[in-house]
Amino acid sequence: MTTRQRLSAERSQQLTRLLTITKTANMRALMEASELAKVIALVAVDIGKSDEMARAFPVLWPKISPQQEYYATAVDWFTNPDETVTSFDVVDMLDAGTSLDQDFMTYLKCLTELHKRRRKYGLILQRQPLPTMVQVSPRALMEYGPDFPPEALASWLTWRKFFYDLDNRSAQETGYLFEPILAAAIGGEAKSARERVVRRTDDPTKGRQVDCWKVLPDGTPLAYELKLRVTIAASGQGRFGEELSFARDCSSSGAKPILVVLDPTENDKLTGLQAAYREVGGAAYVGDAAWAHLEDEAGATMASFIERYVRVPVASVSSFERVIEGDATKRSLILQDLQARLDGNELTISLGGHQRLVERHEDQSLAADGDDDSE
């Protein structure tokens, strides 16, 4: 590698974005250059270009070459620093990867975003404070009595709220991750309401947020609504009205609306939503058809990303839920026994015969609700 004193402004900005795990007011974290280099190496392996990268970087490659696929690799392998790997090495790898596959950078962007969200959630597991009695003790009125003595009820209320907080954080991180990586994978990008690529029919001065905006080679603009599922909860009636009007707003703005729902579970809301899209010349894809559409639009390289990093994990976990007697509204899941233990700073979570240890270092600033990290 040629010795260099500084990166170009463009490369510096690109590297900063890739290395930044989180930069919220409550939490800041960066990757080391060696950690990013290992993610880049994983991309090369995934797309079948590991031999080319090994030849291009004979000294560097043995230090960063993964021995297993991403989900089978412990986070410690990524975070174990190697100071001999520099930012200039990373830039050289980016240049080499880009020359090997036109979708290399898109694949890297998506995998890096997934990795950073997982790393951030790992920090949340370590730092999320246990709830205080001020927060949970009023809830004792629902269960105070003979079943749990006060000391047991105090623990039950605390564990329950703690797990709720962790689940809420997980849902936040998944939400911030899901739409951007799918949008990037199919060659589009998210658009904010301020950009007004889709305007509200009843007030054209206001825009609509678009999960994925993509313009076809023939100039046809597509406006995607990407959803994990469509729920039937009554509390979502107002939001559902917004979802129904999205298709009409797209059509009046000259864009073709496309609905993609990964969960195949049918309900009246989903049926109505599909009809709203099709009535204005749009399209709707649900379940297997949704996955197939995403992979068709993504092309071979990014389709493999969607399959490996999104579809397989979701399907693998979902497979343990069983539909009863062919009725999709009736489902069963045999839960493994749960045990939780907090000993000093060590949290142990056991499920059946499986165990996870988390070294805890609470950060009280994370006790506040919300931690918008939608950068």
UniProtKB/Swiss-Prot annotation:
GO molecular-function terms, A-Z: type II site-specific deoxyribonuclease activity
EC number(s) recorded for this UniProt protein: 3.1.21.4
Catalysed transformations (reactions): Endonucleolytic cleavage of DNA to give specific double-stranded fragments with terminal 5'-phosphates
Disulfide bonds: none
The entry's keywords: Endonuclease, Hydrolase, Nuclease, Restriction system
BP-aspect Gene Ontology terms: DNA restriction-modification system
Name of the protein in question: Type II restriction enzyme ApaLI
Species for this entry: Acetobacter pasteurianus (Acetobacter turbidans)
